[in-house]
Amino acid sequence: MAAKIKSGDLVKVIRGKDRGKEGTVKQVLSNDRLIVEGVQIVKKHVRATQQGQQAGIVSTEAPIHRSNVMVIDPETKQPTRVGITVKEEARDGKVKTVRVRVAKKSGKELA
């Protein structure tokens, strides 16, 4: 299945303690989880290392499941589902089929 949420997408959290927050996807992990900027902040206790890092409590983003976020439609600025359409493009004199992500609400292509 093609990836419907990619790094750099603007998403809105629809479930959980951070419901309603928006952020950009920093990283997509292999187990259907995402790291979203400014969402799911947790405090992590860190030991001092020999390289000079101090011990203490560090705030960092934890992964959130992809079912708990929706991509924001760039045209309507509202959360939307993502669909995939197949279109043909001419590249180097050859016609190739390309899968494109499309916002369901507006029908516009997502970057």
Curated annotation (Swiss-Prot):
> Matching HAMAP family, A to Z?
Ribosomal_uL24_B
Name the coiled-coil region(s): none
Q: Family, per the entry?
A: Belongs to the universal ribosomal protein uL24 family.
Q: What's a single GO MF annotation on this record?
A: structural constituent of ribosome
Q: What is this protein called?
A: Large ribosomal subunit protein uL24
The family database entries (InterPro entries) matched by this protein are listed as:
KOW (IPR005824), Rib_uL2_dom2 (IPR014722), Ribosomal_uL24 (IPR003256), Ribosomal_uL24_CS (IPR005825), Ribosomal_uL24_KOW (IPR041988), Translation_prot_SH3-like_sf (IPR008991)
Please explain the role this protein plays, according to its UniProt record: One of two assembly initiator proteins, it binds directly to the 5'-end of the 23S rRNA, where it nucleates assembly of the 50S subunit. One of the proteins that surrounds the polypeptide exit tunnel on the outside of the subunit.
Annotated keywords? Ribonucleoprotein, Ribosomal protein, RNA-binding, rRNA-binding
* The UniProt record lists the keyword Ribonucleoprotein: yes
Question: What highest taxon heads this organism's lineage?
Answer: Bacteria
- BP terms from Gene Ontology: translation
User: Is Heme found in the keyword set?
Assistant: no
- Organism in which the protein naturally occurs: Bifidobacterium longum (strain NCC 2705)
